[in-house]
Amino acid sequence: MGSANNEYEFLSEIGLTSHNLGSYVAGKWQANGPLVSTLNPANNQPIAQVVEASLEDYEQGLKACEEAAKIWMQVTAPKRGDIVRQIGDALRSKLDYLGRLLSLEMGKILAEGIGEVQEVIDMCDFAVGLSRQLNGSVIPSERPNHMMLEMWNPLGIVGVITAFNFPCAVLGWNACIALVCGNCVVWKGAPTTPLITIAMTKLVAEVLEKNNLPGAIFTAMCGGAEIGEAIAKDTRIPLVSFTGSSRVGSMVQQTVNARSGKTLLELSGNNAIIVMDDADIQLAARSVLFAAVGTAGQRCTTCRRLLLHESVYDKVLEQLLTSYKQVKIGNPLEKGTLLGPLHTPESKKNFEKGIEVIKSQGGKILTGGKAVEGEGNFVEPTIIEISADAAVVKEELFAPVLYVLKFKSFGEAVAINNSVPQGLSSSIFTRNPENIFRWIGPLGSDCGIVNVNIPTNGAEIGGAFGGEKATGGGREAGSDSWKQYMRRSTCTINYGNELPLAQGINFG
């Protein structure tokens, strides 16, 4: 694989070689796009080569997907659930290999890589149960001998465009639900994590083949903006789920809206943790460490802003600075590493540029603030003391950079939390019930995820995941998110011989 490095030998266990076709369309592997190399962010050396999909591959795949949709939507929901159960079992059988690949190709530490694959397995389990609970309402009719009810039917095809930071979890949030709801899936993985796209798809394809189902039910393509743009423009895809930057997400939304399609957007986050004067300081400090340093600050739910009550400011900061100095930076596959590399050399450059902007706006670096010299994309975990009014605080720097802000009252803290354009995740540390219920109430956090005494990141799959404002407003994963993947029809049935009209209208 890319080198004689023993580190890569396990890839053959999940169907990968030194040269891979990056397009699974019409039930077969083919690819006629450009040849790219996927790189190990720990050293920027090639892991393997991938041939990306072309627009011709895309069109062939969508035609087959259209035909497969006619078959898949007629399979009973519990049977579709059984297929998703088998996909979960297939992932379980390769959990460690897939987790290792994710760590190798994306750069997150091994525990997080395995945890991400486990999240997809959990989504499969959730979807299996859901397949017997796609319930519609039965509604009393005001007219005699009439019945009203809701029917939920598949949309047909769901497009899923995922990002590098969670190259398979976000697929799981969408695809597991879309499949049990009777939709085919067209997946475009991130261009910098093609191997995880291929490895995941191979397992899904094996399950479909074993059950004599069309492979086109799950169509996957490695590629860049050209393929993503095709998905956004395609009227055959009624729903497009996009995870990525606000800039690209806005373009996707405009393109899909122009054809009257629907979008699920999971864009940027600028998440805050509030530590009140009555908080458990140790619990808060441990939570902030994971929230700010985990995945090298490349989660959409990473804690970017730490709001400390003036009475506990010094104490919390002292604990955090001690913890930060003990963070092991290094190869994400090595035991004990807590901070792996940023995903690309460009990410490392953006970190360095961001630090200069922060300094120019009055930011005081308390620890970190430097890129680590060497061949990988490593940077130091960074804590910065800064004013809440600094313009840079309103932006998302996708790196382990934590802004520390001081406040005097609960109301001031909530105002700072809500002062940014994004509205994904938030958390407060307090023992006071009044603070808790004000925080989760209508005048509290304006985010889609509102936590108490836990980090901003690490969401469970049972709840709906998503945010408000510039984050996009979509909801994926658990709860009743499934309704976004189906078409709702209100049906009124007359089983009598008369024709009474609603609202008592007499017409002729």
Curated annotation (Swiss-Prot):
EC number: 1.2.1.3
An MF annotation (GO) of this entry: aldehyde dehydrogenase (NAD+) activity
Active-site residues, Swiss-Prot/TrEMBL: E266, C300
Signal sequence segment: none
Annotated site, Transition state stabilizer, chain positions: N165
Enzymatic class: oxidoreductase
Binding-site residues, NAD(+): G244, S245, S246, R247, V248, G249
Family matches, as CDD domains: ALDH_F7_AASADH
Description of what induces expression: By abscisic acid (ABA) and dehydration in roots and plantlets, and by salt stress in plantlets.
Keywords: NAD, Oxidoreductase, Stress response
SUPFAM superfamilies: ALDH-like
InterPro entries: Ald_DH/histidinol_DH (IPR016161), Ald_DH_C (IPR016163), Ald_DH_CS_GLU (IPR029510), Ald_DH_N (IPR016162), Aldehyde_DH_dom (IPR015590), ALDH7A1-like (IPR044638)
GO biological process terms on file: aldehyde metabolic process; response to abscisic acid; response to desiccation; response to salt stress
Domain of life: Eukaryota
Catalytic activity: an aldehyde + NAD(+) + H2O = a carboxylate + NADH + 2 H(+)
Pfam families: Aldedh (PF00171)
Similarity annotation: Belongs to the aldehyde dehydrogenase family.
Subunit architecture: Homotetramer.
Protein name, as recorded: Aldehyde dehydrogenase family 7 member B4
Biological source species: Arabidopsis thaliana
Gene that encodes it: ALDH7B4
